[in-house]
Amino acid sequence: MTVVSVEHALAGKIPEGGEVTVRGWVRTLRGSAGLAFINVTDGSCFAPIQVVATDTLPNFDEIKRLTSGCSLIAKGVLVKSQGKGQSFEIQASGVEIVGWVEDPLTYPIQPKPMSPEFLREVAHLRPRTNLFGAVTRIRNCLAQAVHRFFHQNGFNWISTPIITTSDAEGAGQMFRVSSLDMVNLPRTAQGEVDFSRDFFGKETFLTVSGQLNVEAYCLALSKVYTFGPTFRAENSHTTRHLAEFWMIEPEIAFADLAEDARLAEQFLKYLFRAVLDERGDDLAFLAERVDKNAISKLEAFINAPFEQIDYTEAVKLLQNSGKKFDFPVEWGLDLQTEHERWLTEEHIGRPVVVTNYPEHIKAFYMRLNDDGKTVAAMDVLAPGIGEIIGGSQREERLDVLDARMAQFGLDKEHYSWYRDFRRYGSVPHAGFGLGFERLVVYVCGLSNIRDAIPYPRAPGSAEF
């Protein structure tokens, strides 16, 4: 007897009339005279499959006591279903109950609406819900598509370190990594913590970005990317921030900002097409329950050419919009989400790439433009969310990089390895960063980024 996934059984990939076995969990159960209709899910797709058990089964009394969350193995014949909205069902020849729910009344995942706030408290159980099952499958689809896109386009995947001594963003909001005894810290003669006696012999941190490290491989392999966890010790209690999240960071050699922007557009459209093609059932559920535009916004995004405008032009448009914003609009200030959304939703009506930002609001490694006031940076803005990608052409001139590092108060000796890239065969290169959870939020229409990752880490919250 063939063990099949629910997805394959419902998709008609198994011959009708064949004997099959499915393994999964009870979503719902209803009964009538001598019959039990069990909706079983195994997580392979959104829809459950109906298992029909009759009172001829020796354990039918047990079967009738099944509740949501119980696990089972059902064997039987796959037949076309007469029920509405179902393609196939299983006429059971046997139902083995593997695991009971200890107390159905106190089981946290009940067949009723549950708020995201409550489900964050039981994050270890929330993938059993319709919502988080859908989000998880879409997250997986996006991750697979990320690797597929880069592989098909000749990129090498680079595993950059999680433990580092460098602050790639220059913001100083990093988590320290130490094996020192916090109760009895070793001290120098000056009374400072003696990190030479720490595990690595120096002060180390969790990475805020893999970009600096991946640049090394870009300048040898031409097209590379990193996709891994990053950490920010920002004390931000917002719906848009996490302390631990995943970043996608491609880097391309012999490239300028225009090529970087083209790559970003191709990349996003590829990802959205993959989700539309592969996870239509989950998107349909999200469109019904979470975001009515879950499908239409992705289709519109794919079909719209990106608009590109200069930061200075964007500021003028915002200042002349006649709209009252909560945050000021002035040249030299970063654009806020409300500004980004006005540009994409009310003024232009499609994705926008804003380029050439003031040099003092962007990172030290971004290439200084000829005007001496702006850098070759870009933000990709999407309707409904604002910034979704941030990138730049990197500063390939050693003297300019050194001046920028001095401006930011960075010790160039500490970054000597990074400066080596400019000393030995330097070339123009560019790249961008895409926060993976922000991407999941956008695709799924979620209102809180803590629902876009299995176990959210945020200020005051590190459960599970």
From Swiss-Prot:
Homodimer. It comes from the Bacteria. PANTHER family: ASPARAGINE--TRNA LIGASE, MITOCHONDRIAL-RELATED (PTHR22594:SF34), ASPARTYL/LYSYL-TRNA SYNTHETASE (PTHR22594). Its main location: cytoplasm. Gene3D superfamilies: Bira Bifunctional Protein, Domain 2 (3.30.930.10), Nucleic acid-binding proteins (2.40.50.140). It comes from Xanthomonas campestris pv. campestris (strain ATCC 33913 / DSM 3586 / NCPPB 528 / LMG 568 / P 25). It holds the Pfam family tRNA-synt_2. NCBIfam families: asnS (TIGR00457), PRK03932.1 (NF003037). One of its GO terms (molecular function) is asparagine-tRNA ligase activity. This is Asparagine--tRNA ligase. It is found in: Cytoplasm. Keywords: Aminoacyl-tRNA synthetase, ATP-binding, Cytoplasm, Ligase, Nucleotide-binding, Protein biosynthesis. One of its GO terms (biological process) is asparaginyl-tRNA aminoacylation. Its EC number is 6.1.1.22. It is an enzyme of class 6 (ligase). It catalyses: tRNA(Asn) + L-asparagine + ATP = L-asparaginyl-tRNA(Asn) + AMP + diphosphate + H(+). Disulfide bonds: none annotated. One of its GO terms (cellular component) is cytoplasm. Belongs to the class-II aminoacyl-tRNA synthetase family.
